[in-house]
Amino acid sequence: MAPCYCHLENRAALKIEGEDRKNLLQGLISNDALTLGRDRAAWAALLTPQGKFLHEFCLVEQGETLFLEGEAERLPDLTRRLTLYKLRSKVTLTPAPEFAVVALFGAGASEKAALPETAGAAKPVFDGIAFVDPRLPDLGLRALLPRDSFAATLESAGFEPEQSGAYERLRIGLGIPDGSRDLEIEKTTLMEAGFDELGGIDWKKGCFIGQELTARMRYRGLVKRRLV
């Protein structure tokens, strides 16, 4: 398959800015926010205090801004929840509709973006930022690109528009969940959804919301069902 692109219209971007941006997320989400940088993206989740799924998203940093890409329809709810925890932290949360979330996949996609096929590898490219999918490099790349020009930019770089839902078939075939389409809100746990195997949990980072149940399921082998 030639390198292709797919505009993920069900995903949207949020800008997280301010000197406390990483520290705020560090105590809330399942992955290590302190290790994020312009060369490393991560996949993470926000849980209920009881350890049940609320939101999943990718995070990547560019300059002094953390970009979060998550479910478009549910981004206001995620923003509201993060704001509740912000308190006096020096953090601002701003929707970024000027960016489109785009999947780049197929033979040679990473090479065209000059990225190694390493989960989470990231760099500024194509007038935005791209990163190898932090869950599984076989899924290709994610990119946050200017909405008005990404198609022309990518086609000039040798990417073709996807045909007949090729990216969705690839995602499903690899068993990669896509937000609340595949995970039950306030019901699914991270261990059931494969977050451990897909790099969505950092067990060394310290506490996060819902950590107690998540850790107990891991260390006591309490997982009774899994997403397949």
Segments and roles (model prediction):
Residues 1-228:
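Basic, glycine/lysine-rich polyanion-binding surfaces/domains
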